[in-house]
Design a protein with these regions (language model features):
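Unchanged
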Residues: 45-68, 78-134, 157-162
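A generic fold-level signal
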Residues: 4-6, 16, 32-33, 85-87, ...
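Conserved N-terminal beta-strand and adjoining loop/helix that marks the start
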Residues: 1-22, 44
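Low-complexity, intrinsically disordered Gly/Pro/Thr-rich segments
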Residues: 141-149
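Conserved Nudix-box catalytic region and its N-terminal flanking loop in Nudix hydrolases
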Residues: 20-61, 149-150, 155-162
């Protein structure tokens, strides 16, 4: 069976001092399969859109700011991750400079600045705890990981860097 994932972006907006990250607390829609979890910002890449343009658009739509400086931190394949078992392929970015003032909330939930050293305390997808340290570790090499899910649970995790 061919691998035809949903292509998406996931971005982590850093505060100007680099000590905090803008997270969405998915608390607005009772039918949200991510209800109660914290996550970065992002979403599906649209047809005829490259991943960088998709990341910029998602940050604009979800946070109301413009990305001035981005860095690709890695890619992640999430087989079986979707609500109905769909496969996802994510391009993960940090946004280190932006223009504008972030929104306080959007239709998915509240936007909150969180200290980087407190991220591990938040309710989030189990797998995020494995790859988030790689997003913020300062290693200039992007990581490339695979994290299969089944029934909403991470099954395994592996990655490489080059």
């Amino acid at each position: 069976m061919p691998y035809t994932p949903i292509v998406a972006t996931l971005g982590y907006v850093l505060s100007p001092d680099g000590r905090r990250v803008l997270m969405i607390h998915r608390n607005a829609r009772p039918d949200d399969h991510q209800l109660g979890k914290y996550n970065g910002l992002g979403g599906k890449v649209e047809p005829c859109e490259d991943v960088l343009a998709g990341m910029r658009r998602e940050i604009r739509e979800e946070a109301g700011i413009e990305c001035d400086e981005l860095q690709l931190r890695g890619t992640l394949s999430w087989p079986g991750f979707g609500k109905h078992g769909e496969d996802w392929l994510g391009f993960i970015f940090t946004i280190t400079r932006f223009s504008g003032t972030p929104l306080e909330r959007n239709p998915e939930g509240a936007l909150e600045w969180v200290e980087l050293d407190r991220l591990h305390e938040l309710p989030m997808w189990e797998g995020d705890r494995h790859f988030l340290p790689l997003v913020f570790d300062g290693d200039p090499r992007p990581f490339h990981g695979v994290m299969p899910y089944r029934d909403g649970r991470m099954q395994s995790w592996s990655y490489s860097r080059f």
